[in-house]
Amino acid sequence: MSGITPERQTHLKQLEAESIHIIREVAAEFANPVMLYSIGKDSSVMLHLARKAFYPGTPPFPLMHVNTTWKFKEMIEFRDRMAAEVGMELIEHINEEGRAAGINPFDHGSAKYTDVMKTQSLKQALDKYGFDAAFGGARRDEEASRAKERVYSFRDKHHRWDPKNQRPELWNIYNGKVQKGESIRVFPLSNWTELDIWQYIYLESIPIVPLYYAAPRPVVERDGMQIMVDDERLPLEDGEVPEEKWVRFRTLGCYPLTGAVESTAATLPEIIQEMLLTRTSERSGRAIDHDQAGSMERKKREGYF
């Protein structure tokens, strides 16, 4: 069993109510909000909450996916299927200059690749469509720089984050006032934990990308990470042969930069049980979080989510 007690269900309902309140506040307060959809488990929960917030209607904002062109194939298939099911507009943005220049995580390194294909691409999209608020699925328990984030994260006209220039958030009162060109990144899942996310997915029967479930997959070991060979673009090193292992992913990103974990957890109760025994962060498998000192905070200051 998943071990979700009645008290635990009450806790999840409180988190749900808080998130729905935040989503409705943004829809009421901002002129042109958007929901960033990264296709991961947190995005799936956030989308589910948005649909609940405006049921039986459709959420009054579009979904947007910043596509680096290096996502897992199963992620893109899942994205297209979910967009069709929920009936929301899906905006896909690719940094065409970066793609034309052939920017990739192998020849250019994870730091430059992330800056060009994620950070700059996101800023391009926000400017192009004039969004004044963008929902994201980040949680405070994920990583140190995210632990000090506000629910409403103020960004200047260059989309930069200054942790010393943020607004107080008293109780459930949020200040969304922005000048022309400024914006707010909004994190409705700020107070959720990874365990909360999984238990809520189980209780609400929320569909997620199959990569979260353990299965035999071809992987190679690099820098202590199990990298899945998702397509022919992954260059194999001399003598490197993919090995089929039972693995799953705790977090999903670009496949050359996302490490799998060895696991046999193929159902939600098994994943939750595994979570209860795990003592490492889910983002320990994301190379972009460790490519330089203070990596995530530096990226956020430059405009990353």
Curated annotation (Swiss-Prot):
Pfam families given in the database record: PAPS_reduct
Disordered: region residues: 283-305
Signal peptide: none
Reaction(s) the record says it catalyses: sulfate + ATP + H(+) = adenosine 5'-phosphosulfate + diphosphate
Enzyme class (EC, first level): transferase
The protein's assembly and partners: Heterodimer composed of CysD, the smaller subunit, and CysN.
Role according to the record: With CysN forms the ATP sulfurylase (ATPS) that catalyzes the adenylation of sulfate producing adenosine 5'-phosphosulfate (APS) and diphosphate, the first enzymatic step in sulfur assimilation pathway. APS synthesis involves the formation of a high-energy phosphoric-sulfuric acid anhydride bond driven by GTP hydrolysis by CysN coupled to ATP hydrolysis by CysD.
Full protein name: Sulfate adenylyltransferase subunit 2 1
Organism this protein belongs to: Chromohalobacter salexigens (strain ATCC BAA-138 / DSM 3043 / CIP 106854 / NCIMB 13768 / 1H11)
